[in-house]
Amino acid sequence: MILNIYVDGSGGPNSGYGFFVKETGESFYKKEQNITNNQAEYMAIIMVLKKFLDSNDEINIYSDSKNTVSQLNHEYAINSDQLRTLAREAWDLIGKYTNLKIKWIPRSENLAGKMLGS
């Protein structure tokens, strides 16, 4: 089975992050104070990587954060120590997957953003 998982995160006074699984309708959102948009996007991806680690399904993670996706795919440099720490955690988890893709999508196509109300 292919799982298409949409992630989203937001910074600011109502910061938090979450995901939505298109095939099952499962969604999750967690409030997290004092984080940036980029940190929230990383946290959403890490949460998905941890949750589905034991799955044998093909996993496609979609994010509307071009910066985060490009950094995780080694296309952009990471200049923030906080983001570098989150990226290392994500890369450690990514290495445990055999069939995983992390892709950028436009905000208008992000089902997590629509479902989570961000």
Model region roles, listed by residue range:
Residues 41, 45-46:
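Short, conserved alpha-helix that lines the donor NDP-sugar binding/gating region
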